[in-house]
Regions:
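Short, structured interface segments
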Residues: 4-10, 87, 95-111
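Ferredoxin-like iron-sulfur electron-transfer modules
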Residues: 14-27, 39-63, 74-94, 109-124
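C-type cytochrome heme c attachment motif
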Residues: 66-73, 93-101
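A generic structural signal for residues embedded in beta-strands
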Residues: 132-134
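Short beta-strand-centered aromatic/proline hotspots
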Residues: 139-152
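Short, solvent-exposed secondary-structure boundary/capping segments
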Residues: 152-164
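Intrinsically disordered, low-complexity, charged/polar segments
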Residues: 171-189
Length: 189
């Protein structure tokens, strides 16, 4: 990721898709990730209700750390390439910068008081669309509406989604959304 920023600052044009392929090939060649966590870490209930926060759904330790560089408050650390990110929820202010920077789309933002989610998205979605809130398996957990699409120069979009049916701590089970009219029908065999 840092190399891509340097190239852009130098004014050199590079195809973003080519960069992603090269980045994936490099990461794949350097490691064999091991599962470190069974479930992502979350803040305690009191902290979760106090202000926005992020959850890094990184369960495997490998050489990836853009989230730690992205955090302007130093709230995300990795002690080695074989560990997962650790979020200091005392320092995390819920700015969501790490959500934009995660190449694995594994960082998710939450504001439980406002019942809002900040979810990375790589497909076209419009503000105002009604969505199904889903878990990592694509199973429907609830309903929401896309309030805003946040754009950053690195080509990762973050959708600010207002939950209409899920409240408080249950929001942290949500890992994405599917526009209602694009939700696939179950296959019958």
């Amino acid at each position: 990721h840092t190399a891509m920023q340097i190239v852009k600052e130098l004014g050199i044009k590079i195809n973003h898709d080519d960069y992603l392929v090269l980045s994936k090939e490099y990461i794949d060649s350097q490691q064999h990730p091991m599962k470190v966590l069974g479930e992502p870490r979350r803040p305690d209930a009191e902290r979760a209700m106090a202000r926005g926060f992020v959850v890094a759904d990184c369960l495997y330790g490998f050489a990836c750390n853009p989230c730690s560089f992205a955090c302007p408050h130093g709230a995300i650390t990795k002690s080695s390439t074989s560990t997962v990110p650790v979020i200091d929820y005392g320092r995390c202010i819920g700015c969501m910068e790490c959500v934009y920077q995660c190449p694995g789309l594994a960082s998710f933002g939450y504001d439980l008081k406002k019942e809002k989610l900040f979810l990375p998205v790589e497909y076209e979605v419009k503000e105002g669309e009604q969505v199904w809130l889903v878990n990592n398996n694509g199973e429907r957990l609830g309903e929401g509406v896309v309030e805003k699409i946040l754009h950053k120069p690195n080509n990762t979009l973050v959708a600010c989604v207002k939950s209409q049916t899920i409240q408080a701590g249950d929001l942290t089970k949500v890992r994405g959304f599917i526009v209602k009219d694009k939700y696939p029908e179950p296959l019958e065999f």
